[in-house]
Amino acid sequence: MKSILIDAGPLIALFNKSDQYHSTAVNFLQDYSGGLLTTWAVVTETSHMLSFSTSVQIDFLKWIQRGGLKLAELDSSHIDRLITLSQQFSDVPMDLADASLIVTSENYKIGEIASIDSDFYIYRNIRNQFLVNIFPR
């Protein structure tokens, strides 16, 4: 099964019914038949943005537990690359979650992402390629 990366924006929208992208996120995930891959940094960012409700945060974690998405394996061996990316794109700027998604795209050879952010058209992976954003905005 083909997988794409997913950023915090669509995940926040999926679990926050008052988010302007909520219905877009729901429809996107209903129509998308592939796998979703993200990082712990994205999960942390999403959970923080859902802090208006502990029950919504728990619903998000249960959704992951049920297989809503898979978590990429990043470890301390990736820190050099995270630093390099953060320095390279410091003018954008690139946060840890975004850098972790670029590193994941390199490690898992994934070229597509679902994101609300336009920054992924600026960021480049180690092969100087940007991620194609397939989330409708």
Model region roles, listed by residue range:
Residues 1-19:
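Metal-dependent nucleic-acid phosphoesterase active-site entry motif
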Residues 8, 98-99:
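Conserved glycosyltransferase catalytic-site signature
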Residues 7-8, 39, 116:
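A secondary-structure boundary/capping signal
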Residues 14-15, 114, 124:
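Activation segment
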Residues 117-121:
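Low-complexity, intrinsically disordered Gly/Pro/Thr-rich segments
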Residues 2-4, 23-93, 103, 107-111, ...:
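PIN-domain endoribonuclease scaffold, especially VapC-family toxins
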